[in-house]
């Protein structure tokens, strides 16, 4: 199977607000549209580039919120408007995947689809392409869902975990269980056991199997669409979604489908992966500088500083002394200085407090 296979498609999920990476990621300009590392390509563009090696470029669809559609058009000018799905309200991934898969199915009912977040790093793209193509071949031949798992290198409470069940082939296992963001002590138990892999949130399926599972497990999504509009057109679909999407449940594809389906498998992968959604995960993924500090495209002078991550705007200089294990991040009208450990919970708390006490202009 090659990337010219006419049945292979991709859905890039790019509608999130990225609040775990606040204040660098803001409501008005979330992280997927940022060139966060100063490499010349945004996270969305890098995801598109990566997936265009696996499926034909004109088989890539982008889900995003309507307020971010112009960012997608500017950053991916080769993607046609019919391949950009504009969601009228923020919802979790289950409604997004259902809508994009429906649009793809109307073009090709034999489609095999990769659904991917837009905020991940892959360090071995050749291995990534190999694993993804093997995965697409697997879901083409089997009515199932396939999650891509990566062997954990540390106890990471900010990640999801997949417990391996029975082996069904080389590197392929039935999923025993999913656990989302465990406490650190449980994450250590998972890693030490050798039975758990990180959940990359990359999952593959054939569209017929997805349809069957939505009909059985989450029938409220897309119910009645095919009966109301038996003759497909993008215009009628967009109008229907603008009216009905807000009524869909705010639930992830993991909770709605994958954790409840009986036909979910995991592939052991080794393509070098990191979730770029949190400060701590970015710190762990990045190459460390002097005293294990990570400085991201920023101008900094440090003395007696260890294990920190720093991200500043262009034209700003930070002089830091005596910090150990901190995040120092500034964007526009917000400066964040907080401990790096378990920062996901801290950042979530601060975002909520700031929004309530200071207003949306700081979010």
Locations of the language-model features?
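Left-handed beta-helix
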Residues: 2-7, 208-363
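Conserved core of the sugar-phosphate nucleotidyltransferase
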Residues: 125-245, 265, 315, 339-340
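A residue-level structural signature of the nucleotidyltransferase/glycosyltransferase Rossmann-like core
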Residues: 113, 195, 202-203, 274, ...
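Conserved N-terminal catalytic core of the sugar/cofactor nucleotidyltransferase
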Residues: 1-12, 20-27, 38-117, 123-127, ...
């Amino acid at each position: 199977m090659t990337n010219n296979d006419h049945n292979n498609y991709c859905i890039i999920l790019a509608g999130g607000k990225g609040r775990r990476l606040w204040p660098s990621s803001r409501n008005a300009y979330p992280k997927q549209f940022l060139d966060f590392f100063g490499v010349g390509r945004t996270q969305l563009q890098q995801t598109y580039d990566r997936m265009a090696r696996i499926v034909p470029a004109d088989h890539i669809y982008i889900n995003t919120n309507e307020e971010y559609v112009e960012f997608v058009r500017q950053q991916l000018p080769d993607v046609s408007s019919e391949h950009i799905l504009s969601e009228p309200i923020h919802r979790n991934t289950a409604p997004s995947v259902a809508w994009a898969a429906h649009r793809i199915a109307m073009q090709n009912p034999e489609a095999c689809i990769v659904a991917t977040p837009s905020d991940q790093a892959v360090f071995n793209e050749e291995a990534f392409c190999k694993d993804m193509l093997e995965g697409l071949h697997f879901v083409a031949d089997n009515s199932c869902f396939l999650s891509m798992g990566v062997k954990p290198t540390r106890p990471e409470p900010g990640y999801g975990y997949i417990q391996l069940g029975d082996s069904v082939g080389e590197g392929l296992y039935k999923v025993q269980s999913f656990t989302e963001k465990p406490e650190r002590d449980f994450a250590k138990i998972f890693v030490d056991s050798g039975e758990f892999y990180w959940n990359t949130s990359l999952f593959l399926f054939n569209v017929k199997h997805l349809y069957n599972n939505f009909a059985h497990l989450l029938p409220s999504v897309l119910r009645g669409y095919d009966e109301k509009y038996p003759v497909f057109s993008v215009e009628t679909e967009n109008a229907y979604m603008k009216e009905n999407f807000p009524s869909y449940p705010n639930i992830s594809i993991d909770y709605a489908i994958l954790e409840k389906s009986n036909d979910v498998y995991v592939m052991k992968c080794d393509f070098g992966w990191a979730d770029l959604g949190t400060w701590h995960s970015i710190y762990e993924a990045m190459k460390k500088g002097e005293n294990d500090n990570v400085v991201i495209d920023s101008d900094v002078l440090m003395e007696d500083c260890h294990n920190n991550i720093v991200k500043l705007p262009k034209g700003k200089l930070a002089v830091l002394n005596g910090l150990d294990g901190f995040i120092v991040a500034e964007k526009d009208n917000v400066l964040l200085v907080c401990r790096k450990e378990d920062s996901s919970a801290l950042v979530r708390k601060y975002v909520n407090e700031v929004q309530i006490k200071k207003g949306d202009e700081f979010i």
